[in-house]
Amino acid sequence: MITEKKKRRLRPYLLLGLGLFYLFHWLFKLWLLAPDTDSVTDVFGLGKLNWMSDHLGDKSWFDFQFTPTSLLIGMSGFLIAFLLYLRVTDTGTYRYGEEHGSARFATKEELMRFRDEDPEKNMIFTQNSQMGLFNNRLSFENQINKNILVYGGTGDSKTRSAVKPNILQGNSSFVTTDTKGILIHETGKSLIEKGYKMKIFDLITFLNSDGFNVFRYIHNEMDIDRVAEAITESLNRNGHEGDPFWPAANKLLMRSLIGYLYFDGKLDHYLPNLGQVTDMIRELRRNHPEAESPVELMFEDLERRSPGNYASRQWDLFNKNFDGQTRASVYAIFATTFSVFDHEQLRKIIEKDTLEIEKWNIEKTAVFIHIPEVDPAYQFLSALLFSAIFDVLIKTADAVILGEHPTKTKEDLLHLQVWADEFGQIGKIPNLPPIISVIRSREISIKMMVQSQSQIEVLYGKENTKTIINNCGAILYLGSNDLDTLKYLSERSGKQTLNDQNYSESRGRNASSSKQNSKIGRELLTPHEVATIGTTEALLFLSKQNVFRDQKFNLDTHPRAYLLSNGPNDDNWYRYKRYLSDIDEWKDQVGEENVIHIGIKEVEEVPLKVS
């Protein structure tokens, strides 16, 4: 509690001093009127005081005939008022019991005000802490942005205590990353019962997956830049460091190739795909110094059909600024990166688009993105997908909010939660720091799950990491061994004030002892104490609140936990089928056992009946 001692105002004491001055002067004059008493029987003159009390009304209250003695007596009254004014010389500010810090653990009752009255409309943090997902259902003072940073190492129950309980809530659309590829099977039934559309993008096996064709979401030159930025930023894995020369060259060439396919697709009425970028890269080099390469001829043809187009301008800019060995190096980088599209299965999942990203925040949708745990070769594709997700959904939300959407109104806009498990494996998402600052107003939130703060810093740099963390309304700590992370959370916990008692004793001829009480400051949680919380415990740091220490959420206590699957052999295991081509779907519907394999000879022997 803050206690502030302020300097007293002079004017009231000045008026008091004048009043006492006159009162003392007037009483002295009344004293002079009192008859003398016997000095033997009334040594202290109390008889005169008794007479004065009995004759207060005999003397006029107005007496301005001052004598030297009455002035002196009056000044003594004024001096009393002056001493009263000076009696407080300490004008400091005090916080009794909080001299070294006011940190303490939050209580369950204190966090109750952040909950929604409807349990299904809450986000689940720990066993006893939840927060309403929709700010319009909470009072203004209890509204916190819904971005969350989750710290948790391997085996710290990130999926079981954080991801699964919130999926079971079924209160929004979801985008969830999964490095094992089983979360959709374990939670799918609960989502189907809630009426969700299911989408799956598998970068682990490239099988049984929906398709993602980024060209479906390119509508103008700015979109070309966004796609090129997403790919080149992911290739530059430490994008906050190093020579900017190479990223600049990469971006120019990337804009040129993607732009060519975009404009050529519009002119010839087809939907391009990233695999065709690989085909163009193979034709970049000249076979003879004097003979133009196939790609050069393609750009010349595009310029004839669409003069001054953006792709041709970027191509000219690239050729004018980079030549010789530099150009060859850029070609080599692109050839290496895009060689992943030589895999037939990968080309299949980027040929057509069935994800329908623009519908995710207006139709209840659950999206599962399977990303490899250790292989970074496809990070540029997952980063590109997330770049498209944020761009498309922000545009959809803006259209709905501004009343420009053809079929939906503001009441139809759904909240969308992105649960990004193993956030560092996604790759660098372009412009994430500003994106995370603005998605709140679009009913979008991101939950970033990392093992340490350094995982974010590697991708985005220290300053951008600060921006990302500052835009998180909550930090949920499940466990970590990273010292920087532990120090940060210890500092965030704050310092508390403790009573300290020192006792000393000396022995000998002049034995003595003393006891001294004092107050000291101490971290509420030291880095060691943060690191050694119980395996079933969690720490929750809500914005502007004290840290809350609680048990991790027990998944079995969720009302809909019975819908979860424990393995392929139980009835809750969700199975799905996606077809990457019409032939695959036809084969699956017909059944391999019903397919008759015949050769050309057998076909020639089939009699043809002509009517």
Where are the language model's segments positioned?
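Basic- and hydrophobic-enriched, low-structure N-terminal and domain-boundary segments
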Residues: 1-156, 160-163, 506-507, 606-611
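P-loop NTPase motor domains
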Residues: 28-32, 144-444, 528-549, 562-611
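Short alpha-helical interface patches
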Residues: 53-60, 68-122, 221-231, 276-287, ...
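A broad, low-specificity signal for short, low-complexity segments enriched in glycine/proline
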Residues: 107-114, 128-140, 160-161, 326-332, ...
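A short glycine-/small-residue-rich loop at the edge of a beta-strand within enzyme catalytic domains
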Residues: 112, 118-120, 380, 423, ...
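Short secondary-structure boundary/capping segments
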Residues: 190-192, 215-217, 462-465, 491-496, ...
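Short loop or secondary-structure boundary microenvironments that flank
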Residues: 371, 375, 422, 450, ...
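Conserved ATP-driven motor cores of ASCE-family P-loop NTPases powering translocation/secretion/packaging/pilus
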Residues: 436-438, 445-539
